[in-house]
Amino acid sequence: MKITSLKNRNLLTMNEFNQSELSHLIDRAIECKRLKKDRIFNLGLNHLNICGIFLKPSGRTSTSFVVASYDEGAHFQFFPADNIRFGHKESIKDFARVVGRLFDGIAFRGFEHEVAEELAKHSGIPVWNALTDTHHPTQVLADVMTVKEEFGRIEGVTIAYVGDGRNNMVTSLAIGALKFGYNLRIIAPNALHPTDAVLAGIYEQTPERNGSIEIFTEVAAGVHQADVIYTDVWISMGESVSVEERIALLKPYKVTEKMMALTGKADTIFMHCLPAFHDLDTEVARETPDLVEVEDSVFEGPQSRVFDQGENRMHTIKALMLETVVP
């Protein structure tokens, strides 16, 4: 299906684009990856300026925006979190209107999703959600690209997400399922199932029904015949919860070699949006080893595609900027 121009479009949630437009972005990202491998740089963003507002820590996402910008000839400017105090001395609206006159796009990572919406409303330039408390759409673009590279398709693929079913990744993956046509199984304890309100919002705001969303409590049933087992850390950035209570809830959902075998498929892959606790090489994991959400043998094993996902963050972000920025 022919798509209309994506110029000056935002990516605040996966619902900003329809299936054809999202598929086009994935195909463009795959092409960007090929060109990068061949060291071909077309400078599609030459002499443009990209603004980076990162109010939460960021590794892969921020560097992906930086590298993608420089590859295509753009300048990327970080605004340090300490320099931005929305609502203290300057409103989001006023800040956005100035930035919109100086820059050609905004990458925003923060807490309240409403801040991203305000930036998009008043800046007049594309705003890309690099993660908020409720959505993480740029990660799902990389995930879908990784799945398509692995299986040659995304439609009909079964992704089993194991862990905290209420986080921003699950929400974005769920919208992505209805858009792209993959089947998402959310496998979590009852206390961490997505709320009825969140699920209702996903279905209400997503017109497509190309894939499915199912919720499981029992691991074996949820992962059976899954093409992908996906997990994330058990406590999200900025989340204030009892570590002991969260471990007690999610320890049965730790991704292990045994869980991978429960799929009954030899070609099941493992995915993780990173950063991950998979060994004792971090202070947090050494202090609380029971917080490790995936066995190191799975994370480092032949079924793992976590570093493909990490690389594909850059290619999908590059495609997103090339398609949406007005030159």
UniProtKB/Swiss-Prot annotation:
Q: What induces it?
A: By N-sulfodiaminophosphinyl, the inorganic moiety of phaseolotoxin, at 18 degrees Celsius.
Q: One GO BP annotation here?
A: L-arginine biosynthetic process
What does the record note about activity as a function of pH? Optimum pH is 8.4.
Where is it localised? Cytoplasm
Stretches of the chain forming a coiled coil according to its record: none
Provide an example Pfam family for this protein: OTCace_N
Q: What is its EC number?
A: 2.1.3.3
Q: Which domain of life is it from?
A: Bacteria
The answer to keyword Magnesium applying to this record is: no
The protein's UniProt keywords, in alphabetical order, are: Amino-acid biosynthesis, Arginine biosynthesis, Cytoplasm, Transferase, Virulence
Pathway given for this chain reads: Amino-acid biosynthesis; L-arginine biosynthesis; L-arginine from L-ornithine and carbamoyl phosphate: step 1/3
Q: What is catalysed by this protein?
A: carbamoyl phosphate + L-ornithine = L-citrulline + phosphate + H(+)
In the UniProt record, does the keyword Lipid biosynthesis occur?
Answer: no
Q: What else is known?
A: This enzyme is insensitive to phaseolotoxin, a potent inhibitor of OTCase.
Q: How does it assemble?
A: Homotrimer.
Q: Which HAMAP family match?
A: OTCase
Report the sequence similarity comment from the record: Belongs to the aspartate/ornithine carbamoyltransferase superfamily. OTCase family.
Quote the function comment for this protein. Answer: Plays an important role in the survival and pathogenicity of P.syringae. Phaseolotoxin is a virulence factor that inhibits the catalysis of the host OTCase. Phaseolotoxin-producing bacteria do not suffer autointoxication because they possess the anabolic OTCase ArgK which can function even in the presence of phaseolotoxin. Reversibly catalyzes the transfer of the carbamoyl group from carbamoyl phosphate (CP) to the N(epsilon) atom of ornithine (ORN) to produce L-citrulline, which is a substrate for argininosuccinate synthetase, the enzyme involved in the final step in arginine biosynthesis.
UniProt-recorded name of the protein: Ornithine carbamoyltransferase 2, anabolic
Q: Which organism is it from?
A: Pseudomonas savastanoi pv. phaseolicola (Pseudomonas syringae pv. phaseolicola)
Q: Tell me the lineage of the source organism.
A: Bacteria, Pseudomonadati, Pseudomonadota, Gammaproteobacteria, Pseudomonadales
Q: Gene encoding this chain?
A: argK
